[in-house]
Amino acid sequence: MAASLATARAMHMRNLGQSSLRVSEACLGTMTWGVQNDQRDADAQIDLAREHGVNFIDTAEMYPVPTFADRWRAGATEEILGDYLDRHKAARDELVIATKVTGYMPRSAVAAARTTPPTSPAPDCRLDAASVKAACDASLRRLKTDRVDLLQLHWPDRYVPLFGDTVYQHKKRDDEVPIEETAEALRDLADAGKIRAFGLSNETPFGVARWHQACEALGTSDGLASIQNSYSLVDRRFDADLAEACDRCGGIGLLPWSVLGGGLLSGKYRDGGGASATSRFIKYPKYMARWCPDTASPETLAASEDYCRLAEEVGTTPADLAIAFVRTRRFLDAGSVIVGATDLDQLDANLAPFGEPARLDDEVLAAIDAIHKRSRDPSCRL
């Protein structure tokens, strides 16, 4: 039985962005539930996270991933979380539940799964008003709840480079749904009590600025709470333009994903590092190719090894160093670090440091920056 949040271990809480959502510094990620983890595993992970003081859980309508896995089914992760919430009704008011609407994806099983039976032929995932509202309603059904606390847009409707792509291609696609239409749909969902706040994901500085402009025109800028983008020792792109955009557009909080570079920065894929047959890059070779040991660039692998050696030199684990670095970033003051795992020992180890403030002395930070300067964002290169 999970501890109530009143008796859970201490964890720093903060408002997410400028919203009224009060969230823990760590957020439980769920993307493996339904592929690498089953209902029993998920229940145990939620209970353990709550014992650590976590009140924030992130999922998505397209989860689990990878979508090419034999067991994949759109919405399965939300159903697993919904089953837990249905059996732990008292926990619902203690927890902040975030999910994500899928961005542009042609002929998608994710969009088809919004209806029962699934729509055939499969429609496109888009961020037009009708699609956003249908996605939210489907998520509410699967989650067995009357509201989503944070509804995020998994990626934009317009074309942007995504998930390892690094170069914007002019005029690759120009049939985008206007941001204003999507913003109005989110306002309608908030007015109906179906969502409390909304967020972006895998966005660009241009997108953040346009979203802020659209929300200000609608009077809903205080509802734009967060942005969920990749951030880690091997992907620090957020440090520059996005950090400025989020700061100047009302203080949008960051929810960094893959803070361990898909597990590469944990050190478990080094020789003797403890990777098993169920580890992500062993079970699904070439998934997240920019971080997979078999396909990552030599620069990425070298930088990861440098960070692992630095962790050894300062007497900590590679995972603790990687997570501590992210926690020390100022733009995390109004955000939350997404932490996921496939086994309880791994999750317990990754959540344990959150009981204390993150501390890295100046020498360690200087050493991290020295590695970064030698190999700047290696997983984001051509």
Regions found by a protein language model. Name each.
Residues 50, 141-144, 191, 247:
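Non-catalytic positions within long, well-ordered alpha-helices that form the structural scaffold/packing
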Residues 15, 23-27, 55-56, 94-100, ...:
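Structural preference for beta-strand elements that scaffold enzyme active sites
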Residues 17-36, 98-123, 152-167:
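N-terminal small/glycine-rich loop or linker at the start of catalytic domains
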Residues 108-152, 160, 230, 234:
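Active-site gating/metal-coordination segments in enzymes
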Residues 37-50, 128-142, 183-184, 208-212:
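Short, acidic/polar
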Residues 2-100, 130, 146, 277:
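N-terminal binding-site loop/beta-alpha segment at the start of enzyme catalytic domains
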